[in-house]
Structure formats: structure tokens, C-alpha cells
Curated annotation (Swiss-Prot):
The keyword DNA repair does not apply. Disulfide bonds: none annotated. This is Fumarate reductase subunit C. GO terms for cellular component: fumarate reductase complex; plasma membrane. It comes from Vibrio campbellii (strain ATCC BAA-1116). The lineage of its organism: Bacteria, Pseudomonadati, Pseudomonadota, Gammaproteobacteria, Vibrionales. Belongs to the FrdC family. The chain crosses the membrane at residues 30-50, 67-87, 107-127. SUPFAM superfamilies: Fumarate reductase respiratory complex transmembrane subunits. The keyword Transmembrane applies.
Length: 127
């Protein structure tokens, strides 16, 4: 064993702010924060649904609060942003070929968004 101290380069907590790629990455990962709140709100909604009509009405009034509506809008925008980043990565991760020719990346991404729109429409019709 050696008593020599290895060189450890000091890294500031804000190192990622200097690199556009890492800023984008941190922004994408931060989209989970409003989604956590949205999930907590829905969990409490399920609990109030079980407790009865009065608790359910209280939860509906809570969800009508402008701050909660704003959090839900931010969560929706965050999830759409997150989906866009994943959809744009898919053609690079899993290139699709038809008859030996690569399918255009834009077509793959647009097909994914079309699937999201179609499924959302079906859910809205059923509900």
C-alpha cells in the first residue's frame, strides 16, 4: 500500500450549466418533478373516491385550484417534452428498414405522435 494521495479534480455542483447538452439533459430529467406532484394528486383522488362523496367533492374542489391547474399544465407540458425527446431518439436506437431501405426518421417520429393522438382520442371517446 502506498501513502500517496491520488489527485482528485474538484468538480463544482454547477458543472453541467456550462454545457448545452447537459443543460438539456437536466431539463428533460427535471420534468419528473411536476409529474410526481400529479401522481400524488391522483393518488389522493383515489383515496377520496374510496372515502365517499364528500371527500370526492373536496378533492374535485382542490383540483380546481388555479395553482393545482397550473401544476397539472406544467406536468402535461413536461410529459410531452419528455415524449418528444424519446420519440426523436427511437430512429437512432432502433433504425427501421422496409425492403432493405431505411425509413425516414421524420416518418418514424410522426407515426409515434399519430399513435399517441389516436390512443388519446380513443380514451376520450370511451370516457
Amino acid at each position: 500500500m502506498s501513502n500517496r494521495k491520488p489527485y482528485v479534480r474538484e468538480v463544482k455542483r454547477t458543472w453541467w450549466k456550462n454545457h448545452p447538452f447537459y443543460r438539456f439533459y437536466m431539463l428533460r430529467e427535471a420534468t419528473v418533478l411536476p409529474l410526481i406532484l400529479f401522481t400524488i394528486f391522483l393518488t389522493f383522488g383515489l383515496g377520496s373516491l374510496v372515502k365517499g362523496p364528500e371527500a370526492w367533492q373536496g378533492w374535485l374542489e382542490f383540483m380546481a385550484n388555479p395553482i393545482v391547474v397550473a401544476i397539472n399544465i406544467v406536468a402535461l407540458l413536461g410529459s410531452l417534452f419528455h415524449a418528444q425527446t424519446f420519440f426523436s431518439m427511437m430512429p437512432q436506437v432502433m433504425p427501421i428498414r422496409l425492403k432493405g431501405k431505411p425509413v425516414d426518421k421524420k416518418i418514424i417520429v410522426l407515426t409515434q405522435w399519430a399513435a399517441v393522438a389516436f390512443i388519446s382520442l380513443i380514451v376520450l371517446i370511451v370516457m
